[in-house]
């Protein structure tokens, strides 16, 4: 295999595997938030605010994977 092919394959795997965890995490966060709002509708604002903050933290991992993939493609 050529070096370019290996570089693109590594970048694709880095992004793909780096997005699996955040995707599962966001799904679990959404599920938990909906259950909590269903049990206590009065606390909707607080739950929603905390959920948005935690989703941002979870998605930051996917953004790091994207940056690593871009570095693998253009720098390595």
From Swiss-Prot:
A single cellular component GO annotation: proton-transporting ATP synthase complex
Residues of the site described as Reversibly protonated during proton transport: 59
Top-level taxon: Bacteria
Predominant cellular place of this UniProt entry's protein: membrane
Transmembrane segments: 8-28, 55-75
Keyword Translocase found: no
UniProt entry keywords in alphabetical sequence: ATP synthesis, Cell membrane, CF(0), Hydrogen ion transport, Ion transport, Lipid-binding, Membrane, Transmembrane, Transmembrane helix, Transport
Bilayer topology: Multi-pass membrane protein
Location in the cell: Cell membrane
Protein name listed in UniProt: ATP synthase subunit c
Organism the protein comes from: Dehalococcoides mccartyi (strain ATCC BAA-2100 / JCM 16839 / KCTC 5957 / BAV1)
């Amino acid at each position: 295999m050529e070096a370019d092919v290996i570089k693109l394959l590594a970048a694709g795997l880095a992004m793909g595997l780096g997005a699996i965890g955040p995707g599962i995490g966001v799904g679990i966060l959404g599920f938990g938030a909906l259950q909590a709002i269903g049990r206590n509708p009065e606390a909707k604002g607080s739950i929603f605010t905390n959920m948005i903050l935690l989703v941002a933290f979870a998605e930051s991992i996917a953004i790091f994977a994207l940056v690593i993939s871009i570095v693998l493609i253009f720098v390595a």
